[in-house]
Structure formats: C-alpha cells, structure tokens
Regions:
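Helix-start (N-cap) detector for alpha-helical repeat units in TPR-like alpha-solenoids
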Residues: 26-27, 63-65, 108-109, 141-143, ...
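N-terminal leader/linker segments that initiate helical-solenoid repeat arrays
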Residues: 1-47, 51, 58, 65, ...
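Terminal, low-structured helical/coil segments at or just beyond the last alpha-helical repeat
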Residues: 294, 298-329
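Register position in tetratricopeptide repeats
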Residues: 38, 76-77, 120, 151-155, ...
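Structural marker of alpha-solenoid helical repeat scaffolds
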Residues: 21, 59, 103-104, 136-137, ...
Length: 329
C-alpha cells in the first residue's frame, strides 16, 4: 500500500478497500489515520483519525505497537503546532501512550520516542535519562548520541561532557567521513569552538569540507576563520576571510573581521585598506570608522584615530565611547 505514488484521495480509497477486506488488521487503520491527519486537521477529520487509532488498538495483536504508533502520531501532531489542540492530543497524552507501550515491552525505539517527547516538553533531565538507555541498546547510532549531546548542552552541562557524547557520535562513522557525517561534524566543530578548543574545531571544519567535497558557502569560511583565530592560525584565518568575501562581497561583517585579524598580526595599513573597501559599500558603516581608529592608534596616528572615533560616534557606534575616553581626552 505505497502512498508516495498516489494522490491522497486515491490512497484513501485503497485503504478503505484494504480495511473492508482485512477488518482485523491494525495496519490498515494506522495507515488510514496517518493519511487522514496528513490531509486535514479539522475537528471532524480528527474524530475519524482518533476512531481509527482506537480501532487499531482494539484489533492489534501487539498492543505495545499500537500504543507506540498512537504516541508517535500525537507527538507529530503537536510538533506541527496546531492552532487549537484536538481534545487531549497533547505531549502529555503522547507520553502516556508510549509509556503504556514500554510497560508491555521496553523496546529501545519506544524509549527513544519517550525521550523525544520529553525533549519537546523541555524536560531535559528526563529526556537525557531516556536517551542514555537508548545509547546502551542495540539501536544506538550517531543520531541518538547527538540527541543526548544536544540535551546536555541545553541543560548547560560542562562542555567536556557534551563533547564526550559528540565524540561517541562521531566514533560511529567510518573515516574518511561521508556526507552523512557532515552535519554532525559541523555541530561538533561549533561545540569545540564554544568550548575554546579552536584547533579541534578547525580540524572538524576541515573534515566537513572534505565530506561535502568542498561544496560550502561564505558562512562556512567565516566560522572556520573563527576557529583558526582561536587556534592562532592567523594566515589560515586571513585566507578563509578572503574566500568568504569572494563568495559574498557585500557582507560587511567579513570586512570587519578581516580588519580585526590584520590588526592582531600587526598589518595595520592592510586593515585600514580593507575597512575603506567596506566604506565603499556602505559609507555609514560606523564599525569601520572605529576599527580604522584602532589601526591608526597602532600606527601612532593619534590625531587621525580620534577623528575616526568621532565619526564612528556620529554614526552611532555603541562601542566607541571607551576608546574616546581613553585616547582622545
């Protein structure tokens, strides 16, 4: 009963015919309920969905499977954020249903859904407890370790604890990494960056680049540049910012960042040149004037620096007052 090649109405006809021929098969009622909720979430349609789920439970040989499927349907319904919730189709109801399934047989896939529902309810401690059980089971996967890592992150656990779970996630992939591993590499890179592990983050970005065969955008180069700066790999940072600007030549943030890195390595004239290029794009870009002033201070051009700071203040830069107070009074 494949639905992907059929219009929903045609699929409904096929399901009705199947149910009339096999009235004691839970599968027909489950499929019809899913098809119906896909087409409409009006109250009358939802009555039909609920009736089919009740019937599926009534005829099911495996009651746990029926409870699980009802929990999954209610969970999916709530994830779509209905304007008005149908009867008691809440996350709490979904949790109650999946726990009925678990009480019959504690399959890891049921416990995973329990964790997902608790995560949606923002009950992160309970979600983590469920995910940890799944990660000790035969269905542990990169995705399940990633869920646990994100949950720990939201619980504001120590970065080392979060990264330990991400390491377990990545350990389930074979190297060289495929495109399937790419999203997880990106996540770990960002986590490493946030934890101050710039070199590790940079290496993850490098692996991501290889996994997606170089199919990256300007934002990728911007993030990898931040990792390179943290790792004190300044030439790599400069190269990545140049690439980001090449791909998105109107993004002023990249010009500012390129100037900051140039100032950091003592290339103050180059920083001023970059910032003047930014002002060609937007003459009212206040941050550019502030950073020009910083570079001019490094070049002992204090009078010019104060004029640049004054221009930044005139244009509304929120961070220039302290510099004026320190250098221009």
């Amino acid at each position: 009963m494949a639905s992907s090649q059929l219009a929903p109405e045609k699929y409904t006809e096929l399901l009705n015919e199947f149910i009339s021929q096999y009235p004691n098969s839970a599968d027909g009622y489950l499929r019809r309920a899913n098809n119906q909720i896909f087409q409409s979430k009006e109250a009358s349609s939802m009555d039909e969905v609920a009736a089919d789920m009740d019937k599926a439970l009534e005829v099911a040989q495996k009651k746990d499977d029926a409870y699980f499927n009802r929990a999954k349907l209610i969970y999916g319904y709530q994830l779509d954020k209905p304007e008005k919730t149908y009867k008691d189709w809440t996350y709490d109801r979904a949790l109650d249903e999946v726990r009925k399934a678990i009480a019959i047989e504690a399959l890891p896939v049921y416990i995973q859904l329990e964790g997902d529902i608790q995560f949606a309810k923002k009950d992160y401690a309970a979600a983590l407890a469920s995910y940890e059980k799944v990660n000790d089971s035969n269905i542990a996967s990169p995705a399940t370790f990633f869920r646990a890592a994100k949950t720990k992150e939201l619980m504001e656990a120590a970065p080392e604890e979060v990264l330990a779970l991400m390491d377990s996630c990545m350990a389930r992939f074979v190297q060289p990494y495929s495109e399937e591993a790419a999203p997880y590499l990106l996540e770990r890179a960002q986590m490493r960056l946030n934890a101050g592990q710039g070199r590790g983050a940079m290496l993850d970005y490098d692996e991501y680049y290889k996994a997606v065969r170089g199919n990256v955008n300007d934002v990728f180069y911007y993030y990898r540049e931040q990792a390179a700066v943290q790792a004190k790999q300044f030439q790599r940072a400069l190269d990545d910012l140049a690439k980001a600007i090449e791909l998105n030549p109107k993004e002023l943030t990249y010009f500012s960042e390129l100037a900051v890195v140039n100032i950091r390595v003592g290339r103050n004239e180059e920083a001023i040149k970059v910032l003047k290029d930014a002002l060609e794009i937007d003459s009212k870009y206040a941050e550019a004037y502030r950073l020009i002033g910083v570079a001019q201070l490094q070049l002992k051009q204090n009078k010019e620096a104060c004029a640049s700071f004054a221009k930044a203040k005139e244009l509304g830069d929120p961070n220039v007052d302290a510099l004026i107070e320190k250098h221009c009074k």
